[in-house]
Amino acid sequence: MRLYIIGNGFDIRHGLPTGYKHFKSYVAKNDQELYDSIEEYIPAGDEWNELESALGEIDYELILQNSEMFLASYNTDDWSDAYHHDYQYEVDKITRMLSARLKKQFADWVKGINIADADNSEQYIPPISRESLYFSFNYTNTLQQIYAVPDEQIIHIHGNCSYDDDLILGHSFRVEKSLNPYIGPDQDTRIAEAYDSIDEYFGNTFKPSEDIIEDIIKEERVFFSSLKNVDEVIVLGHSLAEVDGKYFAEINKSIQENARWIVALYRGEEKSGSLEDYDVRDSNISYVQYEDI
């Protein structure tokens, strides 16, 4: 039996605008406020190619600093009780924007990608089997719509745009304890509540990769068990990046011991990771051009 592992390069090779640079353009067009906040607080890179990993490096200190103009002194001459909440409101607004609102815009963008446009691609993938199994990191239905692969043959590990409202985005934000460094009775209540807002929204929205992967592996135990007869794995459009390493290691444990791994490459392409790092034997791995699959 054959297993295909599908990454975003698969959709891009079909001419679909599924890269983070395309999401950047979408946000710039549809939500300028969110766009500006991402540019200011998330080190996503010029084309937002680092967006997922950068969600673990949100500059929360800058969020707090930029909101300090709303932190009125209790000794100000025109003090009003309304000032009790202005600072927390501003921090809360930014954290909501960079968590729930970002995820909502991301889901809307994915759902708006027209898979039918893939028919216009000049670079076609060699025929793939409908009887094979598919482990997809993509949110789209390219396999179903273009190749007529049945839903039951595919696992969308980060969610499917047709069925899931809560697509998985972001793998790195870990809050093992509060970000607040000065918890205590002497701390300004407004500042403490602002830290609570950051802890809650980012911690709940962007789970660390280890937790996500462990949860998914447990939830999809039936799928991983079904891989016991797989003797060939073909990787299409995935960089083999370390962030997904646990998936590859789990797949390798689930398939036949001497299964053959075939990694498809564009001409001149280099992968950012290596299957050997995920316990795949070097002797079982072949790197081939797409047209030679």
Predicted regions: what is each one?
Residues 1-36:
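An N-terminal structural lobe/cap that precedes and organizes the functional/catalytic core
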Residues 2-14, 219-293:
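SIR2/sirtuin-family catalytic core signature
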Residues 36-201:
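Extended, H/D-rich, highly charged conserved domains that either
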Residues 6, 25-26, 159-160, 291-292:
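Conserved beta-strand -> loop -> alpha-helix junction used to position metal-binding or nucleic-acid-contacting
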Residues 17-24, 150-152, 250-251:
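Short secondary-structure boundary/capping segments
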Residues 25-42, 261-269:
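Short, conserved aromatic-histidine micro-motifs
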Residues 114-123, 208-225:
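A Trp-anchored, charged/polar loop motif used as the substrate-binding/catalytic surface
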Residues 23, 51, 143, 251, ...:
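Hydrophobic packing residues within well-ordered alpha-helices of enzyme cores
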